[in-house]
UniProtKB/Swiss-Prot annotation:
Biological process, per Gene Ontology: DNA recombination; regulation of DNA recombination
Pfam families recorded: RdgC
A molecular function GO annotation: double-stranded DNA binding
Role, per record: May be involved in recombination.
Major subcellular location class: cytoplasm
Protein name: Recombination-associated protein RdgC
Family named by the database record: Belongs to the RdgC family.
An example Gene Ontology CC term for this record: bacterial nucleoid
This protein's UniProt keywords: Cytoplasm, DNA recombination
Location of the protein in the cell: Cytoplasm, Nucleoid
Length: 306
């Protein structure tokens, strides 16, 4: 269990996450299949294992792991539009009258309801790790919408979840721009070979660089003409690499072989043991990595009144 992306949320109050109570709460909203006329469903699933006996909360040391699954029927807009046009054309030709918006909308709804039972179904899972002692919830997603779906559903079942996206005192873009300009990152961080540069003016240009020497004159010229770094590939110690963006989203997390080998050794031969060992080692690594990342970005910002 290695996260590939990271959206970081700060608990603004102490929340007593009791694993047994959380298990009971999540069980009130389990994931389920879409009924024939349902567009989507959302609920909690076991992060590890399958079957009714698999726990909805995985506990390892002081960390909790939960997962939610979305099931949705995929109905392409083009299919609906084509069917609607065909129906409207048929009515207008046969009845020699114009089909106006209200009737068109009603026809569209009827077409959707007729097509839904035959639509393809897509399933997607989102994982979140809760670190109560650190006051953090870490969501394995790069889309804030996907993370908010999980957090809002968690809030729904436990009654209250005082949480906000974690922010830092210095703009990540300003810090990353400085690192590339000075060709030196913060301690334990190393600039790699990929970045995105954007012009600060509205409708300004975007430059995306991959497998490129970011110390080159070409990159420096872009920075000197006013562009700023909005995405940057980085490494931390010899343990992980990632891409950081200007919204404080950590993407394309990759844990180095040394960590993965250690988890494999710790986990034994059973699949569940391997998953537990990798999750534990990942969370312990985050316990070192995240405070250093926050410090490198000027320190965590604590909004007034919190």
């Amino acid at each position: 269990m290695w996260f590939k992306n990271l959206l970081i949320y700060r608990l603004t109050q102490d929340v007593p996450f009791d694993a047994e109570a959380l298990e009971t709460a999540l069980a009130t909203k389990p994931a389920r299949a879409c009924a024939s006329q349902e567009v989507a469903t959302y609920g909690f699933v076991a992060p590890f294992g399958k079957g009714e006996d698999a726990p909805l909360v995985h506990i390892s040391q002081d960390f909790l792991l939960i997962a939610a699954r979305k099931e949705e029927r995929i109905l392409p807009g083009s299919v609906v539009r084509d069917a609607l046009k065909e129906k409207v054309d048929e009515i207008e030709a046969e009845q020699m009258r114009k089909v106006y918006k209200k009737e068109r909308d009603q026809l569209k709804d009827e077409i959707i309801q007729a097509f839904l039972p035959r639509a393809f179904i897509r399933r997607s899972a989102t994982f979140a790790a809760i670190a109560p002692r650190q006051g953090l919830i870490l969501v394995n997603a790069s889309s804030p919408k996907r993370a908010e779906d999980l957090l809002s559903t968690l809030r729904e079942v436990i009654g209250s979840l005082p949480v906000r996206p974690l922010t830092v005192k210095v703009s990540p873009s300003a810090t990353m721009t400085d690192w590339v300009k000075t060709q030196k990152a913060a301690d334990n961080f190393f600039v790699l070979d990929e970045c995105e540069l954007r012009d600060t003016h509205e409708d300004g240009g975007i430059v995306r660089c991959k497998r490129q020497d970011l110390t080159s004159d070409e990159i420096q010229l872009h920075l000197n003409t006013g562009k700023v770094v909005t995405q940057l590939s980085l490494a931390w110690q010899d343990k992980l690499s990632f891409v950081l963006d200007d919204k404080m989203v950590v993407k394309r997390l990759k844990f180095e072989d040394l960590l993965q080998d250690q988890a494999e050794q710790d986990g034994g031969e059973e699949a569940l043991g391997q998953l537990d060992a990798s999750f534990t080692l990942m969370m312990l690594t985050f316990g070192e990595f995240l405070p250093e990342l926050f410090e490198a970005l000027g320190g965590e910002e604590i909004p007034q009144g919190i």
